[in-house]
Each structure stands twice: as C-alpha cells, then as structure tokens.
Swiss-Prot record:
Its EC number is 3.1.1.73. Belongs to the tannase family. The gene is faeC. This is Feruloyl esterase C. It comes from Talaromyces stipitatus (strain ATCC 10500 / CBS 375.48 / QM 6759 / NRRL 1006). Keywords: Calcium, Carbohydrate metabolism, Disulfide bond, Hydrolase, Metal-binding, Polysaccharide degradation, Secreted, Serine esterase, Signal, Xylan degradation. Its main location: secreted. The keyword Metal-binding applies.
Amino acid sequence: MMLTSAILLLTLGVQLSHADDSSRENFSNRCDQLAKEIHIPNVTVNFVEYVANGTNVTLADNPPSCGQSNQVVLADLCRVAMEVTTSNQSQITLEAWFPENYTGRFLSTGNGGLAGCIQYVDMAYASSMGFATVGANGGHNGTSGESFYHNPDIVEDLSWRSVHTGVVVGKELTKKFYHEGFHKSYYLGCSTGGRQGFKAVQEFVHDFDGVVAGCPAFNFVNLNSWSGHFYPITGNSSADTFLTTAQWTLVQQSVMEQCDSLDGAVDGVIEAIDQCHPVFEQLICRPGQNASECLTGKQVNTAQLVLSPIYGTKGEFLYPRMQPGVENVDMYITYNGDPFAYSTDWYKYVVFSDPNWDPATLNAQDYEIALAQNPSNIQTFEGDLSAFRDAGAKVLTYHGTADPIITGETSKVYYRHVAETMNAAPEELDEFYRYFRIGGMSHCGGGTGATAIGNVLSAQWSNDPDANVLMAMVRWVEEGVAPEYIRGASLGSGPGAKVEYTRRHCKYPTRNVYVGPGNWTDENAWKCIL
C-alpha cells in the first residue's frame, strides 16, 4: 500500500510539473504574440520578452544617475518596453510588466526627485502581487533637470503627462494581453511619485480607483524654493553660520531630549511632532569650551532658521518648517554647505533659464517669480477634490515624522487646505481621503521605529491589509473597508530580517500617545488621540 501511494504521489508530481511547464509555455507564447498586436498611435515598441520569476534583469539602458543597473523579477511575466511620443520635442520611456499570476488589477508606479528614472523596484513589487504594472521615466533620462532647459514639453511630461500617458497606454495593453481586461486600477508612488498620485486625484479623477501617495512633493514649486533656501542659511563650510556634523549631532540630541518624551515614551521616535518646538540657546559656547561641543550665537540662529517656514515678500506663507529631529540626516543632505541639486536645477533650467544662476542668491522675490510661473500647474496643490470623491475613488497618503527631504508638515498643511476648501470635517474626508503619519519614518521608508508598512518592496513584511498600505487600498476599494490605522513593523537588519516590534500608526488628525501599561514596543500600549 505504501509503495502504491508513493507511486501515485510521484505520478501526480510529474503531472503537475508538466502542467506548470505547459502553462508557462502558453504564457510565453502569448507574450510573443503580443509583440505582433501592438498598434497604438505614438507608441514605438522596443522589445517584448517573457521573463521568468527570479531572473536578474540587466537594465542596460537605465541612466547611471538612476543608480540601478539590474532588477530581480519576482514573477513570471511578459515585459514590454516602449517609447511614447508626447509632443514634437518630447517622449517618454515606458515599460509594462504583465504577470502570469494576474489578479485583474492594473497599477501605475511613479517617479522620484526630478523623475527621469523608471522605478523598477516598484514594478517588481507590484507585479509580484499580481498587478499588471506600468512605469515611465517622467519624460527624460536621469536625475538632472538639465533637460528642462528651453523645453517646456519635458516639464509638462514631469508635471502630469508621463504618468497619465502611461496609464492610457498601459490600460489598452492590459486589455489586449489579458482577455478579461482589468476590473480595478491603482497607483503606488512616493515623493515625486506621491505628487504624481495627487495630480491624478486633482485632475485625472478616472485614472485610478485607488491611489497610494506617500510623502508627496505637492506644493512643488514652493518645495523647490524651500529645499533651496537652506544653503543661503547655512552658507558654505567656511561660513561662520555653518555647523559641522558634530555640531548638528549636538542639535539633534538636544531635539530628542526636548521632544522624544512628549508622546509618553522615550523610544527614539517623536510621535508628538506638532508639540515639538525646541530651543537651542543652551548650546551656546561657554568660556573655554571646546568649539566642537557647542555653538556660537550665529550657529544657534542657523539651527532655528532651518526649522522655520518660508514666506513671500509680503509675509504670505509658502511652505512649512522642516520637522525637528532629522538634523543627523540633513547634515549630509541640505545642511552640508552645498546647494541642493534638485532646487538648483529647477531654478537654473526652468525659473531663470540661466545655467550660471547662483543658488547662494536665492531669496523671497525669487520664490514669488517661480510660483507665478507654475508651468503645467506642476504645483499640484488644488484643494477641491470633489470630482475625485464623486467618481467614487479613494486616496490613502502617508508621511513620516522624520522625513529629511520633504517635511511631513506639508502633508498636514495640504490636508487642512482640502478640509477648508471643501468645507469638510475629517469624518467627511474619511469617505475618500485618509492621511496617516508614520512615526520615525524617513523619506519614503527607513528611519527609526515601526516604519515598514508595505509601501515598497523592502518594507513588505506582511500582505495583511492592516499592515500593507497597498493591500489596505485594495480592501478599501473592493470591499468598502477603510483603514482606521496602518500597522508598521520595526525590522532587523540584513537578509530575512525579522519583526522586532509593531505599532499602529494613526489616521490624521489623531496622534499616537503611549498610555501603557506595557513596554513601548507593545502596540497595545499606544492610543490614537486628538
């Protein structure tokens, strides 16, 4: 009997293997056939290829500044690479990844920085989850803004046209490749990708049923002014207003001493970011004190100024403060005595069309000149989202309280802008727009604390909708169950990192407070309060 059972199991295994091989061959043949069926205006197909799960794809055409030469594919899929003409002087590079384990869902990824790079990691992540996935390069190659010089069409691609065109083409290809087409459409992006998601929310309300937009770069023109204004404040490394990394470390330590406990727990995470308003006069050098262990009065002023909003020439508010507590990161990014590259490129190649423009001269009058231009409405700061709401679509946005690139304060400012414009209280906005503050999260991920929320591949520790923002959006759209919180995890380092602890991140306008009685690593010891 045992021998008979073993033979049956072996036979079944061989049959299943043959079935898998046959299914894979059929899928590969469908991929080959697709190459002959693509006839879309303005679309030039570079190649169509079947890629097996686990293949490490070489990205030979990816610009070096994008920092990615290869990507491991996480599903058997059909890869389509294209160029799409968007005007007589612009085009986008577009890819579509169609997985064999298709769930009937379409998804577009976004970009980062000044765009110019397809987010292949996000494409691998989404396609592994069964989404037909598209990604574009924002209308130019690489991270520099030099392509914008005297070419407003490329700026328009960056503003909205790259993502929207990718969606239009991608949906048509999805319907062509899969007989059933798609039943729901989603978006997943962060930073510039977050802004691109909100551009769809504000202007292309039928592109997506659900948008996940992280750390959004909306209020884009003022964001570039704000990012650029740190250099005139700190000066270069020889200026008497400049702080060394040792001195910024002192400032950051002082912030944590003053603010970490405001949420009830000393855990290296400032949850009570709205209540954090540090002072630094106590750091001024005393007679005989080592200069690396203290600050001059001018340096204290620098530390206060970088934590202040920016205003126009008439005192009008333009962009909020950098949230305190990120000095130990920003001392390498925007407080390092060098101009911030993205802001410099925006002003050189778009605002002033002058490659010789000096970023040290940036001032409030320049902010106003830039804002008045707002090419292709790249600001992405419309407050009336009623058309998106009425279309039945949903948007979930998240932002870290320790973001050193795009201050988390800007998502709070935008939420209030929408509430005031639409005359809508939080419970009304909750029907279609939910914002979560992620304690300790850096820019789009990482940082200190339970920051892994499934927004990117490296932060995927669970596919439970309570612990994965993408699947939370799927559940909201398809089952009508809206997320009340997002569970994040603190992950150990290295391959196969395990969960150290979890925390439920609160829906704005509530905030996380430690109430005990357990350890601060116990998610049940925290409560969301107003």
